[in-house]
Amino acid sequence: MFAEAAEKHHAPLRQLSDDTILYAACDAHGATVSYRLSQEWQDVRLNLPGAHQIENAMSVLAMVEELRRQGWTIPDQAVYEGLASTVWPARLEWCGRILIDGAHNPQGVRALRNFVEEQLPNQRRVLLTGVLADKLQEDMLRDFCAIADDIVTVTPDNPRALDAQTYADALCQHGAHAQAAKSLEEGLAEAKRLAGDDAVIVAAGSLYFAGSLRTALGLAWR
């Protein structure tokens, strides 16, 4: 399909493989990767957490090389600095000990669960979460329960939001220790109390919830 589209639009097509990745080391805040494409890119620091960002960055580097082939001047330093400073609000975004992620569908919640289990395996975690009623599914409940020892639910600021108490009850039915908060501010305060000095707060769910939380935390949109 991609080959047909590229031929139709007279666009260059480049196929990449896992062999392109020479070295990769992921951590909770990003990754350091070395690639071999048309040139070698050594120790590229990625500011976006998540193993999938390694392949995304590989596509970026392939695009840079193609643009250079077409005559664009793009210094190596600009590429390294760009990847090291890239931000994506509410996508595995850290604010101190709070990890914010707009995981609002089964795939997103499973990816978040995998991330915290791989990168924060020995870290006590508290989940602060709010979802839309028409988005929540059974497998999401199971994965949310696996993310944290304690869960605080809130009602997102949206007409389609799932009531915090109803959400907490559903999580409890899946074995979680969950409680509902009357507001985002109350929920954040309770999550911080439960977290104490040693736990990470994972804040996940609807993008409406994540956006409101970012505003409450004073994070800039850029």
Name each model-derived stretch.
Residues A5-D27, L46-A51, A78-S85, A103, ...:
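Beta-strand->loop->alpha-helix junctions that form or flank phosphate-binding loops
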Residues L22, F209-G211:
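Short, active-site-adjacent cap segments at secondary-structure transitions
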Residues M1-R14, H29-A31, I98, P106, ...:
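C-terminal helical cap/extension that packs against the catalytic core
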Residues S206:
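Active-site-proximal loop/hinge segments that shape catalytic or ion-binding/gating pockets
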Residues M1-D43, L61-Q77:
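Acidic, Mg2+-coordinating active-site environments of NTP-dependent enzymes
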Residues S38-D150:
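Nucleotide phosphate-binding/pyrophosphate-handling subdomain across enzymes
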